[in-house]
Amino acid sequence: MEPFIVNAKTDLYAILGDPISHSMSPVIHNNAFRRFGMDKVFLAVRCDPEHVDEMMRSLRFMDLKGYVFTMPLKEMVFSHMDEVKDEAEITGAINCVQNENGRLIGHNTDSRGFWTAVASRNVKNRPINRVFILGMGGFAKAAAAQAALQGVKEIIAVNRMEETAYVDSFRAFAGRLQKKAPHSTVRLMDWDPAGWK
């Protein structure tokens, strides 16, 4: 395999967050780019959450083809999008952005990965009417959103109710979800460790 040389025509992509040094995204994406002979590079960039507004103004006009956000930026960048896809609108979080000539389109692809895993286990290809989600964090919201978009009628989310920040945030999300997918019912349940004995 010939060595890859970055040049003035190389397409640039990035993952942004803080902390970011632990991210495996550059390794995964750059290996895929090399394997398929693509003239693309994927970088990890640390972005201080206190400067997210300045970062988004800059990213809009930079020639990055797309970027990925990790915590804690996923919810912070939402208001900077020109267009938001359904999954992202419901969850209130953006993890992927397409930059089309300065027009930012926000996606939440976490939800698609969840549903692909669920569907792969549905070997009898029966309708999935109920899902059980452990936790009420960002990924739980993405999973619930995709389940509703796929027609699931009942979504049960379980968490320790003493974790009020997660619970309050999930309740607000559930309200948005009900408006977008009125056929789905979201139930929140307490996961009390005392009940495990």
Walk through the language-model features, giving the residues of each.
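Phosphate/diphosphate ligand-binding glycine-rich loop within oxidoreductases
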Residues: 2-123
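Short acidic low-complexity segments
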Residues: 179-197
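Residues at the starts of beta-strands that form the adenosine-phosphate
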Residues: 12, 41, 130, 153-155
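Glycine-rich adenosine-cofactor-binding loop
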Residues: 17, 106-111, 118-122, 127-152, ...
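Structured loop/turn residues at beta-strand edges in well-structured enzyme cores
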Residues: 62, 92, 126, 150, ...
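Short, solvent-exposed amphipathic alpha-helices that sit
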Residues: 24-34, 138, 142, 146, ...
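General small-molecule cofactor/ligand-binding pocket signal
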Residues: 43-45, 156, 186-189
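NAD(P)-binding Rossmann-fold cofactor-contacting core
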Residues: 152-180
